[in-house]
């Protein structure tokens, strides 16, 4: 057949409602808002084309390959309830389109170019189904939940953390002092904030040294294993690795990375190093809201969470749920399960568009952090369960008596909630009573309860189904 130049509708090639998806296909669910006058089939096909083999006109080199083998296909379109102009377009991509073990390449293909497409008003990637054949090309988290518990020798409860504040401006020695005040009080971890890298007021090497001293002193005093998330994020991969190597030489248990600002290539590199060298890896999601906050455009956090599990990280920040609306709770628990479990069933009520099988890729601990304090402890324990990290920054350092009593208050509250749950009490209903009872035995907790008794952060949820 001779080459026929010209422009033809995408849907003639890329909209294939009769296509039966394969177990090896990567499946994507896009929320598409077409421009007025663009039919949904054409918009869905355009997304499939521009994120796989297509371009705006017919090219003669199409004849040199088998497009049927390599093209993305829009195989199903459904309306979005309550939204006249939005549709969910399901696209299947053949596995051959993607480099093995590269989240970078996967995202460059699926979300690389198509989001600036003129025929679309807005486009949001709601979910991805990663086939087991592709999952198996990734190392995933350096260690995973069970190995981390064994390393730390901590079982049967959530882990407790605290972000050191003020996040910027402390000298290395004062920073280390704050770490030392928190850890002996009962916290498992303290944390660098996401933007603590190596600034003029505190260079990274000084911070690492003082924090390591605080960790080892706390361990000697308490008999518990302690850690501080040393942020290795840097301007170059080489510098990042230099910091991770120094952390390993100090003998500390965990380092940290900002995976979105640092990038997936850097993150996967660091995750491989951490597995080879016995370091845990804490992941902060700085910049995520730029990508995931708009309901119509961008990418849902559940996709970023799946990508992180593939790229590698042992902890990741996942929101708090507390004080927010019910729908948001279900959505958050949906991606928390995606992080922790081996096999997650499709469940649209929780925002899960596909069934995901991780074939024993290690799990990631979700981290609840941001605006939480002792009164939230029962709800957090109930919502997140044991396999989580609860992080109280201001909720530790803001204690009226100082950092160490703040740490004690959080640990007492947590142990009280875990004990009450194990005795069969209902944390959702009796939470406040449980905290009040515990505070009779702990003056530190009583003082914390008094300070934060009225604080709430309640706004309407951005993220609805």
Curated annotation (Swiss-Prot):
Pinpoint the site Transition state stabilizer: 324
Q: What PANTHER family does the record tag this protein with? A: RIBULOSE BISPHOSPHATE CARBOXYLASE, RIBULOSE BISPHOSPHATE CARBOXYLASE LARGE CHAIN
Cofactor(s) needed by this chain: Mg(2+)
Q: Alphabetically, which GO biological process terms does the record hold?
A: photorespiration; reductive pentose-phosphate cycle
Q: Which residues bind Mg(2+)?
A: 191, 193-194
User: What residues make up the catalytic site?
Assistant: 165 (proton acceptor), 284 (proton acceptor)
Q: How does it assemble?
A: Heterohexadecamer of 8 large chains and 8 small chains; disulfide-linked. The disulfide link is formed within the large subunit homodimers.
Which residues carry the post-translational modification N6,N6,N6-trimethyllysine, per the record? 4
Family matches, as SUPFAM superfamilies: RuBisCo, C-terminal domain, RuBisCO, large subunit, small (N-terminal) domain
Annotated localization? Plastid, Chloroplast
This protein's GO cellular component annotations are: chloroplast
Protein name as annotated = Ribulose bisphosphate carboxylase large chain
Q: What function does this protein fulfil?
A: RuBisCO catalyzes two reactions: the carboxylation of D-ribulose 1,5-bisphosphate, the primary event in carbon dioxide fixation, as well as the oxidative fragmentation of the pentose substrate in the photorespiration process. Both reactions occur simultaneously and in competition at the same active site.
Q: What GO molecular function annotation could you give as one example from this UniProt entry?
A: ribulose-bisphosphate carboxylase activity
Other remarks on this protein: The basic functional RuBisCO is composed of a large chain homodimer in a 'head-to-tail' conformation. In form I RuBisCO this homodimer is arranged in a barrel-like tetramer with the small subunits forming a tetrameric 'cap' on each end of the 'barrel'.
Which family is this sequence assigned to?
Answer: Belongs to the RuBisCO large chain family. Type I subfamily.
Could you tell me which residues carry N6-carboxylysine? Answer: 191
User: Record's NCBIfam families?
Assistant: PRK04208.1
Q: Which Pfam families match?
A: RuBisCO_large (PF00016), RuBisCO_large_N (PF02788)
Residues bound to substrate are 113, 163, 167, 285, 317, 369
- Mod. after translation: The disulfide bond which can form in the large chain dimeric partners within the hexadecamer appears to be associated with oxidative stress and protein turnover.
The EC number on file is 4.1.1.39
């Amino acid at each position: 057949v001779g080459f026929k130049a010209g422009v033809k509708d995408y849907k003639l090639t890329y909209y294939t409602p009769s296509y039966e998806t394969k177990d090896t296909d990567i499946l994507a669910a896009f929320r598409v808002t077409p421009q007025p006058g663009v039919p949904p089939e054409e918009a869905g096909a355009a997304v499939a084309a521009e994120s796989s083999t297509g371009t705006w006109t017919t090219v003669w080199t199409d004849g040199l390959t088998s497009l049927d083998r390599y093209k993305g296909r829009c195989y199903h379109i459904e309306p979005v309830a309550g939204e006249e102009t939005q549709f969910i377009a399901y696209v299947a991509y053949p596995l051959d389109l993607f480099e093995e073990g590269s989240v970078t390449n996967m995202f460059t293909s699926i979300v690389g170019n198509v989001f600036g497409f003129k025929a679309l008003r807005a486009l949001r990637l709601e979910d991805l189904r990663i086939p087991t054949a592709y999952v198996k090309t990734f190392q995933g988290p350096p260690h995973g939940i069970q190995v981390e518990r064994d390393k730390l020798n901590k079982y049967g409860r959530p882990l407790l953390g605290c972000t050191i504040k003020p996040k910027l401006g402390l000298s290395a020695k004062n920073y280390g002092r704050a770490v030392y005040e928190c850890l002996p009080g009962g916290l498992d971890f303290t944390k660098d904030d996401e933007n603590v890298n190596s600034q003029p007021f505190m260079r990274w090497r000084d911070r690492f040294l003082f924090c390591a001293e605080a960790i080892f002193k706390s361990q000697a005093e308490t008999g518990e294993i302690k850690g501080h998330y040393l942020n290795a994020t840097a301007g170059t991969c080489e510098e990042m690795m230099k910091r991770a190597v120094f952390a390993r030489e100090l003998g500390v248990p965990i380092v940290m990375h900002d995976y979105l600002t640092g990038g997936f290539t850097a993150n996967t590199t660091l995750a491989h190093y951490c597995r080879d060298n016995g370091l845990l890896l804490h992941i902060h999601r700085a910049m995520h809201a730029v990508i995931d906050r708009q309901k119509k455009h961008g990418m849902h956090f559940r996709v970023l969470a799946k990508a992180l599990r593939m790229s590698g990280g042992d902890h990741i920040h996942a929101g708090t749920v507390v004080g927010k609306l019910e729908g948001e709770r279900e959505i958050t628990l949906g991606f928390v399960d995606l992080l922790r479990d081996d096999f997650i069933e499709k469940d649209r009520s929780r925002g899960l568009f596909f069934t995901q099988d991780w074939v024993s890729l290690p799990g990631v601990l979700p981290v609840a952090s941001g605006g939480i304090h002792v009164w939230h402890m029962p709800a957090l324990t109930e919502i997140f369960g044991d396999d989580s990290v609860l992080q109280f920054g201001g909720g530790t350092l803001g204690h009226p008596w100082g950092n160490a009593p703040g740490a004690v208050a959080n640990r007492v509250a947590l142990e009280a909630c875990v004990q009450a749950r194990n005795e069969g009490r209902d944390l959702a209903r009796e939470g406040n009573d449980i905290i009040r009872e515990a505070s009779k035995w702990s003056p530190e907790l009583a003082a914390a309860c008094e300070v934060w008794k009225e604080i709430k952060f309640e706004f309407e949820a951005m993220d609805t189904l």
